[in-house]
Amino acid sequence: MIDQLSPTDFAAWQAAAAPKTAVVLDVREPWELQTASITADGFELLHIPMQSLPGRMADFKQQHAADQPIACLCHHGIRSMQVANYLAQHGFTAVVNLQGGIQAWAEQVDPSIAQY
């Protein structure tokens, strides 16, 4: 079962991940990333579109430990939940889904982020 993480709880989750660096995996398409994006602040921000992840999984596994704290992000939280489940099926044990996606992040954390 993948935990749902609200944007307002992200800072506490990130702090709890220490000393490991948390990863935010943004699975949106490149045009979406250009429209609206969060800024890496004490975490690694990684962009791999959902459809590209299977082909990049071997590299992803080499670069990230199975217990690496990973929060998956998309527009509304649906694609990211699918990716979170995919990562869990591939042995990642500290995966959460950013509930509501970047839309919720813009509404609850950073209103300067464009909404689309």
Language model regions located:
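Short cysteine clusters
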Residues: 74
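Rhodanese-like catalytic fold shared by cysteine-dependent sulfurtransferases
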Residues: 1-23, 27-70, 78-116
